[in-house]
Amino acid sequence: MARKDIVEHEPSYLMHQMPYSETSQIVRIFSQNYGRVDLIAKGSKRPKSKFRSFLQPFLPLQLSWSGKSQLKTLRQAEIHGQYLARIQGKHLLSAYYLNELILSFLRMEDPYQHLFALYASALHGFSESNPIEPILRQFEILMLAEIGYAINFETEALSQKPIEADLDYVFIAEQGFVAKRNHNSSPFVVKGQVIQAINQGNFADQETLVCAKKILRWSIQYHLDGKELKSKKVFKAIERQDGSK
């Protein structure tokens, strides 16, 4: 979508905010039709600022802004739709993880409308305390596809033959799924039927969930090129703590 000098009532979510001056902040948002946008919220740190109560993560917002440069000026903010129930615990950490993915991978001012809709759906699922792992996997899969790094769950990487349910495969982040008979050095083997289940978005089986988590983790780490997400560090600490109980 082409840039516009003035945007009004754009459905958006706050991803991150940082100080800009004694009274103002830079807010990084994810919007429905303009993707990631950075805005200066003038006076937002003042106690009586009109923005103060609205600029919080995970609230459905309508924002208006203006400007020709990459850093726009926030003009108006209001709640769009109903408040979600408060997101807590691991669900809250998972929501911050999605924000980190968005900030790490999405290009500025490119629309990702399908991903925006899935993000909103994910927040609703977190607020209802729905199972976390299927929500994360669905978001990760779509995000990688939207930015051009789609994982091919349909065909074998070398032969381009369809994935077969009764064959075993290994996953190579830079290639995709390779038949085990062609790549015997990997300790992680994925059943063809599991790959097919992931492709269908069917995470009812525990083995599918575990394999999907490993596949998406390796793929995201590969494309992060050595960078580690802060939320992932916290996840690992929680997992170690849970394992010691």
Set out the residue ranges of the language-model regions.
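Non-catalytic alpha-helical scaffolds and adjoining flexible linkers that form interface surfaces
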Residues: 1-26, 30-245
